[in-house]
């Protein structure tokens, strides 16, 4: 049985793919749970239309993310924190702190776009990665200063 997946299914395929499955798996699991639709001519045409709409929307979002990356790339933010012995911070600098500091510079970003491989717990200069889109990554310079 050929079906078009409506969502990603592990070990089977990604959303929008045309896959062949056993009849029982399709009839008893995929179709009743609306995880797939039968691969009819009408459904294939609708799939192509949806792919075109998604590609156009994705291109528009990518363009906006690239514009924002150009603006954000020039920003250098400073965050002041209380420190203890050996320049260790009380607490850490989080993605929310960085988002607020960038907002103070005039650019708003979502804290979920900020990628911190590990928490910032010491004074110094850091380069923080912002994943604005799947294909667009910007970097800002962050300086953590003592209060």
Curated annotation (Swiss-Prot):
Sorted UniProt keywords: Ribonucleoprotein, Ribosomal protein, RNA-binding, rRNA-binding
Function: Binds to the 23S rRNA.
Protein's name in the database: Large ribosomal subunit protein bL9
UniProt keyword annotation of rRNA-binding present: yes
Phylogenetic lineage: Bacteria, Pseudomonadati, Myxococcota, Myxococcia, Myxococcales
UniProt cross-references to Gene3D superfamilies, sorted A to Z: Ribosomal protein L9, C-terminal domain, Ribosomal protein L9, N-terminal domain
Any one biological process term the GO annotation gives: translation
One Pfam family named in its UniProt record: Ribosomal_L9_N
PANTHER family, alphabetized: 50S RIBOSOMAL PROTEIN L9 (PTHR21368)
GO MF assignments: rRNA binding; structural constituent of ribosome
CC terms in the record's Gene Ontology section: ribonucleoprotein complex; ribosome
Similarity remark: Belongs to the bacterial ribosomal protein bL9 family.
Bilayer-crossing regions: none
Xref: HAMAP family: Ribosomal_bL9
């Amino acid at each position: 049985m050929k079906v078009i997946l409506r969502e990603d299914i592990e070990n089977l395929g990604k959303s929008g793919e045309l896959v062949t499955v056993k009849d029982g798996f399709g009839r008893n699991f995929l179709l009743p749970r609306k995880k797939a639709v039968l691969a009819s001519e009408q459904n294939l045409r609708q799939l192509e239309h949806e792919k075109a709409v998604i590609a156009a929307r994705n291109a528009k979002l990518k363009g906006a993310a690239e514009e924002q990356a150009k603006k954000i790339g020039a920003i250098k933010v400073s965050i002041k924190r209380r420190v203890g012995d050996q320049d260790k911070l009380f607490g850490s600098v989080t993605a929310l702190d960085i988002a607020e500091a960038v907002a103070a510079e005039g650019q708003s970003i979502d804290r979920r776009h900020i990628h911190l491989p590990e928490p910032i717990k010491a004074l110094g200069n850091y380069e923080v990665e912002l994943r604005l889109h799947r294909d667009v990554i910007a970097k800002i310079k962050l300086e953590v200063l003592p209060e």
